[in-house]
Swiss-Prot record:
Role, per record: Involved in the third step of the chorismate pathway, which leads to the biosynthesis of aromatic amino acids. Catalyzes the cis-dehydration of 3-dehydroquinate (DHQ) and introduces the first double bond of the aromatic ring to yield 3-dehydroshikimate.
InterPro entries in UniProt: Aldolase_TIM, DHquinase_I, Type-I_3-dehydroquinase
Catalytic function, reaction form: 3-dehydroquinate = 3-dehydroshikimate + H2O
Binding-site residues, 3-dehydroquinate: S6, E30, W31, R32, R62, R186, T205, Q209
EC top class named in words: lyase
Gene name per UniProt: aroD
Pathway linked to the protein: Metabolic intermediate biosynthesis; chorismate biosynthesis; chorismate from D-erythrose 4-phosphate and phosphoenolpyruvate: step 3/7
Protein name: 3-dehydroquinate dehydratase
Organism name: Streptococcus gordonii (strain Challis / ATCC 35105 / BCRC 15272 / CH1 / DL1 / V288)
CDD domains per record: DHQase_I (cd00502)
Description of how the protein assembles with itself and partners: Homodimer.
Amino acid sequence: MKLVVSVTPRNLEEAQQIDAQRFVDADLIEWRADFLEKEEILKVAPAIFEKFAGRELIFTLRTKDEGGHIQLSDDEYVEMIKKVAQLYQPDYVDFEYFSHKDKIDEMLEFPNLVLSYHNFEETPENMMEILSELTSLTPKAVKVSVMANSGQDVLDLMNYTRGFKTLNPEQEYVTISMGRVGRISRIASDLTGSSWSFASLDEATAPGQISLSSMKKIRDILNEN
């Protein structure tokens, strides 16, 4: 599994002060641009892409509807993603599929899409249908992050992930059960076929996130011969 760490600057000064060396153990960097005001995103973008030049980077604009910090219309959301993608070519571009479904045709031209779905309340009963619909669009990655309210929620998502990965071996999946009970899903991603696990450096960006240092130790232990 690849370890992903988010950067969440709230203004240009914070972005300029990021010490990229602190992220050396992360395999991917996720820029959560939703911690900024809409007008600041394109002003801060050069600093982020300069700081992490040569690193794999995910551009994410997480809206309030899916647990983020910014509220945008569908048009504003797509326009901002397109601008950043065209100007800076991040390795991955997150798109909240079910929240902005009417705009998906405008995004399919991008070969580096992460089609995502987030639910901070529950693990929906129709998880198989959700995974199936996202998979049918053949994005670069399918990402699903849902709240686990029981151990069974966690086991169900892990089983669904393993099943979909077995049937679609070329498709990248990233599935996470949020919350304390879901932490095992972050550790066992190699077993289920989930490609990434999100870890925290300073503050967690989702419930149940484990620190980068702990995740690195866990990964090293699991990879021992």
